């Protein structure tokens, strides 16, 4: 009511969250957006966490909504594949190198390409949907994937 906030996390909760978040900072900070420029994992952390959490929750909602009335294969894609393709299609686009450089230095959102190629490799259901294996370019070993919640 009065805008008063109280910290309900324990010190251990905060420490664990910081450690788990650092996995995402490091992952995104190692993405080469241009040959001479890496993404800024610190700058984009909040939005990357939001994308990750949103994907996890929306996928659970999708599975819940379709459990009693399963969807079939359409155009050769399973419902689970279509879920992830729909997410990816939102971020499709072309962008000039100058704008990549500008946004990477100033925007707290990852570039569209990395909101897909950086987010999906941390979602176990994406691996299952597409049968992603170690030989696939976006594969991230399970122990290196972000697990926040």
Residue ranges and their predicted role:
Residues 1-149:
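Zinc-dependent metallohydrolase catalytic domains
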């Amino acid at each position: 009511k009065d805008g008063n906030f109280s910290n309900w996390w324990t010190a251990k909760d905060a420490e664990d969250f910081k450690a788990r978040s650092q996995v995402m900072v490091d992952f995104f900070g190692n993405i080469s957006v241009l040959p001479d420029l890496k993404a800024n994992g610190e700058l984009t952390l909040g939005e990357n966490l939001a994308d990750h959490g949103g994907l996890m929750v929306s996928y659970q909602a999708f599975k819940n909504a379709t459990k009693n009335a399963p969807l079939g294969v359409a155009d050769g894609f399973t419902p689970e594949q279509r879920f992830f393709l729909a997410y990816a299609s939102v971020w499709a686009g072309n962008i000039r190198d100058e704008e990549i450089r500008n946004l990477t230095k100033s925007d707290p959102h990852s570039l569209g390409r990395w909101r897909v190629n950086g987010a999906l490799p941390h979602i176990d259901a994406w691996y299952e949907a597409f049968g992603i294996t170690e030989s696939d370019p976006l594969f991230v070993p399970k122990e290196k994937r972000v697990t926040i919640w």
